[in-house]
Amino acid sequence: MSTDKKQDESIAEKDWKVELSEQEYYVCREAGTERPFTGVLLDEQRDGLYVCKCCEAPLFPSDTKFDAGCGWPSFYKQLDDGNVDYREDVSHGMRRVEIFCKQCGSHLGHVFPDGPAPTGQRYCVNSLSMTFKGEDNVEVKG
């Protein structure tokens, strides 16, 4: 096996192309964004946990989800585990903070400083980047 990190990463990306649908790959691995109001998890209201679609790292508890009216699932707080990583995004002539899964590097969405109390944060997350695991043991993939 190669010890060249770049080569190992490209092999991993090949694997993601097999594991994910074309749209999931675009959102999760190429930092794309799904169209607003199209995500399966936007209207999910049950109690449970939102996890990373790619590695199942726990991301957001359902009790921090709120309707921001923006067209994507929104949360005001990540789990205390800290599986969300932050990077500056200056694409499209804007300055934003992009969020990724800290465990596998999967793109999640963006965080904005216009959310509700108690944090004032709005984690705006693509449904395609998450799986919902309900307390009723029903799983919904975004």
From Swiss-Prot:
Keyword Isomerase recorded: no
> What's the superkingdom here?
Bacteria
Q: Name one GO biological process term.
A: protein repair
Residues bound to Zn(2+) are C52, C55, C101, C104
Please name every pair of cysteines joined by a disulfide bond in this record: none
Q: What's a Gene Ontology MF term here?
A: peptide-methionine (R)-S-oxide reductase activity
Please verify whether the record's keywords include Zinc.
yes
Signal sequence residues:
none
Task: Give the protein's cofactors.
Answer: Zn(2+)
Q: Which reaction does it catalyse?
A: L-methionyl-[protein] + [thioredoxin]-disulfide + H2O = L-methionyl-(R)-S-oxide-[protein] + [thioredoxin]-dithiol
Alphabetically list the UniProt keywords.
Metal-binding, Oxidoreductase, Zinc
Taking every annotated instance into account, which residue ranges of this chain make up the domain MsrB?
Answer: 13-135
Question: What GO CC annotations are associated with the protein?
Answer: cytoplasm
Q: How is the cofactor bound?
A: Binds 1 zinc ion per subunit. The zinc ion is important for the structural integrity of the protein.
Give the top-level enzyme category: oxidoreductase
Q: What is its EC number?
A: 1.8.4.12
Residues of the active site:
C124
Could you say which protein family the record assigns here?
Belongs to the MsrB Met sulfoxide reductase family.
What's the protein called, per UniProt?
A: Peptide methionine sulfoxide reductase MsrB
Gene behind the chain:
msrB
